[in-house]
């Protein structure tokens, strides 16, 4: 992937990321990102971008967001020393316990932030997509918190293997819609949510769950999830007395990983993303997008995707419902291309 850049370009791009200059005004992370959407969705994305610029870093919004993270989500989440794993692997292993956040995963950080934004934008209802179900549960909980109706789209295959989360969403007041088109997993759920958003772009807020899709979503999700890396850095200094040699995170769409990695970009730490290996390296056998994919456009963003020689997006395979996505966030594509991750 480094062949995308001429001498010095990768270093300059990475420095821009460290300095907070990415995405640029076009929503791009170097060659990746951007906004490739139907004309009917352009006003909705422009309205969302304007709302993000107006509210996201406004002191009042940030005060409300930080209060919700502290009093409702339960942050900071713990950093736990894994003694037996450390003994087995011959290295000190620390676990950032996002499982201890309200609803059981990191997804709630992004969900409550976007729900607060949706409330400020004056929409009538919220829609969301989900793969493993965690983002659906988080969206349902966040919408209940701010008093907005919520509809969650979920691939039929994922609904079968994640039935307990479907039940949790419904108990939290959300409507769950099974998507039976396409591969019936996360990609199909995102497609269906986008189709619904087109029908009423001013009355509906689309609460996207990962750092994927068209600008400004990759930026918005990164900003809301960066609390993971910010807390981890301080907790390592407080508890271990030093920063780690390496930080690992799983990568599907990439919201967990970008939340951990982004605050650590400027630090001399090896950043390692782990993808779903599935049953092999061939197309359709895995969800290892960065390891086996090629550049292309998927769901509004130019990024790395799993596609055949004709540019047809391929189905994925993984026992993990949260990692079986045919693409990856554009910032991850950039970070891999520069060699930082």
Protein language model features and the residues they cover:
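Glycine-rich ThDP/TPP pyrophosphate-binding loop and its adjacent helix/strand module
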Residues: 185-196, 203, 208-268
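Gly-rich Lys/Arg/Thr-decorated short loops/hinges at beta-loop-alpha junctions or inter-strand turns
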Residues: 61-68, 89-100, 118, 171, ...
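Buried hydrophobic positions in well-ordered alpha/beta secondary-structure cores of metabolic enzymes
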Residues: 34, 78, 95, 107, ...
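A short, small-residue-rich loop immediately preceding and capping a beta-strand
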Residues: 102, 110, 118-155, 242-256, ...
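Active-site/ligand-binding loops adjacent to catalytic centers
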Residues: 190-216, 220, 273-341
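Short beta-strand segments
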Residues: 96, 153-154, 180, 207-211, ...
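Active-site-proximal loop->helix
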Residues: 125-127, 135-193, 282-293
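Positively charged, low-complexity intrinsically disordered leader regions
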Residues: 5-33, 39-40, 46-123
């Amino acid at each position: 992937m480094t062949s995308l850049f001429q001498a010095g370009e990768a270093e300059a791009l990475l420095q821009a990321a460290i300095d907070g200059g990415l995405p640029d005004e076009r929503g791009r992370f170097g060659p990746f990102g951007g906004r490739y959407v139907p004309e009917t969705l352009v006003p909705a994305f422009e309205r969302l971008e304007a709302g993000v610029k107006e509210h996201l870093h406004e002191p009042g919004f940030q005060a409300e967001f930080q209060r919700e993270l502290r009093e409702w989500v339960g942050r900071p989440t713990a950093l736990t020393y894994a003694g037996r794993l450390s003994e087995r692997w011959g290295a000190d292993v620390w676990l950032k316990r996002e499982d201890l956040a309200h609803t059981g995963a990191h997804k709630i950080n992004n969900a409550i932030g976007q729900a607060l934004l949706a409330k400020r934008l004056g929409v009538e209802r919220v829609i969301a997509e989900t793969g493993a179900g965690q983002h659906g549960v988080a969206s349902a909980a966040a919408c209940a918190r701010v008093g907005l109706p919520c509809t969650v789209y979920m691939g039929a295959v994922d609904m079968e293997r994640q039935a307990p989360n479907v039940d949790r969403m419904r108990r939290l007041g959300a409507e769950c819609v099974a998507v039976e088109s396409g591969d019936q997993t996360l990609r199909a759920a995102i497609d269906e949510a986008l189709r619904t958003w087109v029908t009423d772009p001013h009355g509906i807020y689309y609460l996207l769950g990962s750092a994927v899709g068209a600008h400004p979503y990759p930026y918005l999700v990164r900003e809301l999830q960066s609390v993971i890396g910010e807390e981890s850095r301080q907790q390592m200094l407080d508890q271990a007395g030093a920063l780690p040699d390496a930080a690992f995170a799983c990568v599907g769409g990439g919201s967990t990983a970008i939340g951990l990695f982004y605050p650590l970009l400027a630090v001399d730490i090896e950043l390692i993303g782990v993808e779903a290996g599935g049953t092999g390296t061939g197309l359709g056998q895995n969800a290892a997008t960065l390891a086996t994919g090629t550049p292309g456009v998927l769901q509004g963003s130019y990024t790395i995707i799993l596609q055949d020689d004709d540019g047809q997006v391929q189905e994925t395979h993984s026992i993990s419902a949260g990692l079986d996505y045919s693409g990856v966030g554009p910032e991850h594509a950039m970070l891999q291309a520069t060699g930082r991750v």
